[in-house]
């Protein structure tokens, strides 16, 4: 019984959610051989109905966004931000981030709130990567477009 419970909990772990997302994006990246074909291809009607903050209008924008998020997860947000600054000619010696420090009592509550949100976002991003992969296969006429 303990093994079943542990297996269920592991399936819902943050680590596994990130691995599912990274795997979906890697699959998308390996499938999409010509990303420029995604330009001006509208999102699914189902996708258009869904209100999200990362809609980019076409599949190419989603492709770029998903790869960017994968890189942020794999390499860290700070490294990605430093690469962007170097690319634009801005260099900084220290990261200046203004933060409001929460009370120690609020840390656990804050952690659970953000963890839950992260699980939700990762699940949506994983679905988006899988949908994009399948839509690309349809667009180029690959048979058997299932997962």
UniProtKB/Swiss-Prot annotation:
Superkingdom, natural source: Eukaryota
Location within or outside the cell: Nucleus; Cytoplasm; Cytoplasm, Cytoskeleton
Membrane-spanning residues: none
Primary subcellular site in the record, as a coarse category: nucleus
An example Gene Ontology CC term for this record: microtubule
Pfam family of the protein (one): Spot_14
GO molecular function: gamma-tubulin complex binding
InterPro entries according to UniProt: Lipogen_MT_Stabilize_sf, Spot_14
Keyword set, alphabetical order: Cytoplasm, Cytoskeleton, Microtubule, Nucleus
GO terms, biological process: epithelial tube formation; microtubule organizing center localization; regulation of lipid biosynthetic process
Protein family per UniProt: Belongs to the SPOT14 family.
Function, in words: Involved in stabilization of microtubules. May play a role in the regulation of lipogenesis.
Protein name, UniProt field: Mid1-interacting protein 1-B
Organism annotation: Danio rerio
Gene: mid1ip1b
